[in-house]
């Protein structure tokens, strides 16, 4: 499952292509998402972690079904996994070797 859409991936790749390693590190630190915030948001308001990660549609679905309890628990897990995936994908794009 893609954490970022293709347009965002291309924009980031194009933006960092002329950066040195230190600039890429700074850019990564600015762009990455907090796993803790994503989990906390989904714990407090199911689906809010997904919205924080830019997955608004999924967040709304989880919010509307959270009264079933299982989607709420899934929302917490998914926020954690999605934030980790987003950051890993961001890292691989920023620090790719094919520049």
Swiss-Prot record:
Localization in the cell: Cell membrane
- Keyword presence, Glycoprotein: no
Q: What is its main location?
A: membrane
Keywords for the protein's UniProt record, in alphabetical order: Cell membrane, Membrane, Transmembrane, Transmembrane helix
Q: Which residues form the TM2 domain?
A: 32-79
> Which Gene Ontology terms of cellular component type are present?
plasma membrane
Q: Which InterPro entries match?
A: TM2 (IPR007829)
| Lipid bilayer topology | Multi-pass membrane protein
Membrane-crossing ranges are 34-54, 56-76
What's the protein here called?
A: Uncharacterized protein MJ1516
A Pfam family this protein belongs to? TM2
The source's superkingdom equals Archaea
State the organism named in the record: Methanocaldococcus jannaschii (strain ATCC 43067 / DSM 2661 / JAL-1 / JCM 10045 / NBRC 100440) (Methanococcus jannaschii)
Instruction: Work out whether the entry's keyword set contains Cytoplasm.
Output: no
């Amino acid at each position: 499952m893609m954490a970022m859409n293709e347009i965002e991936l291309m924009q980031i790749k194009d933006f960092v292509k002329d950066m040195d390693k230190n600039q890429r590190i700074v850019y990564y630190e600015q762009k990455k998402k907090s796993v803790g915030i994503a989990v906390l948001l989904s714990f407090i308001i199911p689906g809010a972690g997904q919205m924080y990660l830019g997955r608004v549609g999924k967040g709304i679905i989880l919010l509307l079904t959270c009264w079933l309890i299982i989607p709420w628990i899934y929302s917490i897990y998914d926020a954690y996994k999605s934030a980790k995936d987003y950051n890993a994908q961001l890292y691989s794009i920023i620090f790719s070797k094919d520049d």
